[in-house]
Amino acid sequence: MKYNFDEIIERRGTNSYKWDLVKEDGVIPMWVADMDFQTASCIIEALQKRVAHGIFGYTLVPDSYYEAIISWFSRRHQWKIEKDWILYTSGVVPAISCCLKAICMPGEKVLVQTPVYNCFFSCITNSGCEVVENELKRVGNCTYEIDFEDFERKCADEKTTAFILCNPHNPAGRVWKKEELERMNDICLKHGVKVIADEIHCELIMPGYQYTPFASISEACRDNCVVLNSPSKSFNIAGLQIANIICPDATLRRRINRAININEVCDVNPFGVIALQTAYNEGEEWLDELNQYLYENYQAVKEFFNTELPQVRVTRLEGTYLVWLDILPFELSSDEAYEKLMNDGKVFVNSGTMYGRKAGQGYLRLNIACPRKTLMQGLIRIARVLSQYMDEEDLSGCPA
């Protein structure tokens, strides 16, 4: 590889949310979704050049910003975006809130597919709306599929006005197929439900799978959705706070733009603008190598648990760098496992119940976007703790 993802870079003492939230020494953080790799060197160099200028006043967003987005999605994903569709903002979570305020009235219902990214819940409730769950169906202990009967039943409720899609899905690891996306949109259209597609992990795809932008599938999908994306996950630049709302429908776009301004998330900083342009114009080679390294990390996780502790069932990872571990065979709840791993194992993972009290029970979320040495140290600690709570009758691991 041209880029060294094995390099261990000290992040403690940098006010890192991932590393400095827990003050106790020796804890390996494998939780929140940022990576322990330096971003692409081209981005670092572009930011250094901007810093050298020394003046950091209010910034305009140039045409080259939009051109970078349009070019990237055209050549990487065969999705033709028009400049007018793009609204910039400071992050995908603020974007979700703005979209909900533009689409829903307080008291209405918003559908999500649990287990799912925990901020969806707070965005919905903070908008005065009610969370409705379409729980994904576990298949063969190793992956998930959509319960379409339940999905339509929830959409048919006249109070359900929006559906937040997670594609790729965090934490279930699915990269939804075109046919699945089309079927969901058909149901949403039938019942007047708008789709808000969170596609922030769209560049983090495992070999053999393909991300399909929701709005690229058909005119019907395009006209019924808002797509949210950002280079923050794929290029590890979340702290630069840059994201985009892609909304082809002009009427809805005006409402969202109004919500962005009302909620004062309409300004972005020059570093985010420069980082996005550089990532999309020059970062492709780095991203491809990153995905290869993440795939090797995922293979290492599967091999480790299949060999050392097969009772831990590793959910198939199609996209993201977040591995969903099934610990149902153990005599621990998700929250108990989280506490034991933190206190006894000194490894920080996410309890599955963050992503749905019912759908996430018996699971842990593991961030594998770290150097392999760090990953293996974390896995050893996890196995050492969980092995004390085994149900000896359940030895069923996932197929390799």
Regions found by a protein language model. Give the residues of each.
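PLP-dependent enzyme catalytic core of the Aspartate aminotransferase-like
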Residues: E331-S333, K340-F348, Y355-A400
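Hydrophobic residues in well-ordered beta-strands that form the structural core
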Residues: V112, E133, A197, V349-S351
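N-terminal small-domain helix-loop-helix segment of the aminotransferase-like
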Residues: K2-G91, C98, A279-E282, Q388-Y389, ...
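Conserved core segment of the aminotransferase class I/II
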Residues: E45, E219-Y295, E303, R384-L386, ...
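Conserved glycine-rich beta-strand-loop-beta hairpin in the small C-terminal domain of fold type I
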Residues: V273, Q277, Y293-K302, V314-I327
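A structural alpha-helix within SAM-dependent methyltransferase catalytic domains
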Residues: Q48, E152-C155, N185, L189, ...
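Conserved core of the PLP fold type I
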Residues: F56-D186, E203-L204, Y211-S216, A220, ...
